[in-house]
Amino acid sequence: MSERQTSPSRRGFLGVTGAGALTLAAASDASAAPISEVEKANEKVVNDFCAAWTTRDTDKIGSFLAKDAVYRMIETSPPTKGRDAIMAALKDFLGKAKSARFEVLRSTVMGNTVLNDRIDYFELEDSKLKFHISGFFWVVDGKIKEWQDYSWPKVNDKPQTNS
């Protein structure tokens, strides 16, 4: 049986669509069961992690990640494996930032999975950056074990191609 290769743009689209659908479905279901204490704790870990970005302190930000965490910045980037490698990759960028802030618009938690819809703001020396993000977090034993961000395309963005 041959393996089917899926294009990054299709995978990204499905990820964003799925994350958005889950977020909206969970948010709109007034009869949903209350979240458990573990789910509340997992959501708090992610929200505290997002809040820590205002400090730009890589030790503090990294303290929320499991030692063997995996991070994928956007749907088309390769994963970065291990807390030390993740923080090394982010350290240079954060060092150049005059400010950083994650504004969580809404979040949904299901067991160990936390999804958030947020806007990330970064102020650099000569520019201000703003990204609309759907974040996927898998929390185990109070630490973020997996973190993937999916960007929301702008209205005038061109579709991604495989060429």
What residue spans do the PLM features occupy?
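N-terminal secretory signal peptides
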Residues: M1-P8, G20
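Twin-arginine (Tat) signal peptide motif
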Residues: Q5-L14, S28
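Non-transmembrane alpha-helical segments in soluble domains
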Residues: L14, E43, N47-C50, G62, ...
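A beta-strand edge to alpha-helix "cap/lid" segment located at domain peripheries
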Residues: G15-E37, M73, P78, M87-S163
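C-terminal segment of N-terminal export signals and the immediately downstream linker at the start
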Residues: A27-R56
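Short, well-ordered alpha-helical segments enriched in acidic and aromatic residues
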Residues: R56-R72
